[in-house]
Swiss-Prot record:
Gene responsible for this protein: hisC
Protein name, entry field: Histidinol-phosphate aminotransferase
Assembly with partners or alone: Homodimer.
Disulfide bonds: none
Protein family according to the UniProt entry: Belongs to the class-II pyridoxal-phosphate-dependent aminotransferase family. Histidinol-phosphate aminotransferase subfamily.
Keywords, sorted A to Z: Amino-acid biosynthesis, Aminotransferase, Histidine biosynthesis, Pyridoxal phosphate, Transferase
Source species taxonomy: Bacteria, Bacillati, Bacillota, Bacilli, Bacillales
Reaction catalysed by this enzyme: L-histidinol phosphate + 2-oxoglutarate = 3-(imidazol-4-yl)-2-oxopropyl phosphate + L-glutamate
Modified residue annotations for N6-(pyridoxal phosphate)lysine: K223
Species, as recorded: Shouchella clausii (strain KSM-K16) (Alkalihalobacillus clausii)
Amino acid sequence: MLAKKQIQGLPPYAPGKPIEDVKREYGLETVIKMASNENPYGASPAVAKAIADGASKTFLYPDGYGTALRKALAAKHKVDEGQLILGNGTDEVIQLLCRSFLTPETNTVMATPSFSQYKLNATIEGATIKEITVKEDGSHDLDAMLAAIDDQTRIVWVCNPNNPNGVALGEAELKTFLDAVPTTCLVVVDEAYYEYVELDDFPNSVALLNAYPQLVVLRTFSKAYGLAGLRVGYGISQREIARQIEPVRLPFNNNILAHTAALAALEDEAFIAACKQKNSVEKAKLRAFFEARGMFVFPSETNFLLVETGIPGDVVFQAFLENGFILRSGEALGYPTAIRISIGNEAENDAFIEKAPEILDQLRASLGA
């Protein structure tokens, strides 16, 4: 028996090697992971206490509606609880949107390169995918995306800041785009890296929800909040959009400890502010290192940098892996001669900067680059 045709040939997600496997394979004592854009400072100390306190309740099913977390998020964003869509990470919210609004008779518009889950989930639903190449500076080509919208377009995806290059759109650009998109087409603005943004005119997207009924804003606890291992994400939309999606959401899609941890993380605003400040300092340090060596670094508003090395990304990835640094090759991200590097903590970044010149020089010598 064959699966439905749109998923035949789809490759499964390929996770990176665990740190312990890398140590064993290459005989390393220390391995620094700078690949998945996790928070190198972990989560708020309040999270560990909340999880410990909640561990005795794991025999219970979680609150399937996530009532306490909804109330806290609604208060934070000044929206109604009914405007929230809770997901097992924003990956699930993306899946729910595609399942709810896309069919083989419809199409969806997205930038490329961008976050891969938009295309994957749209493909599974059989929708036609219209990919619009980003501009040379890495930003979304909103004019071209607008031109691609037709009567059958149901979702337009705007990853802001964009993953994998970190480039962000300003509020004026986004509002001009939203003004032109028909209300029959959702505009999903994925703000996974919102807490790291320093751009002065970055959109206050949640505040735009009342003016633009087609707008959906995505946020996550996986990045700055340091809860990647617990999988909590959410969407904010008009009540009617959230109402239509709710029946598609699996019951108990967030576990009981995830709810508890997210609540604790949300309350510790000082921790998030400190992480943002340290990320800014360390990002500037890594950027200066790469630029001093003549490499182009995309202007990132996130906790990662996309760096054009001029060497095939898989080759650079392998060389650093053998020396104890797990990076992300740009070859699978749409940037074949780039690497994406997550911003580590001070010690991790200093270790990288100390070792990287030797690795890069050896690579260039071996390739005659």
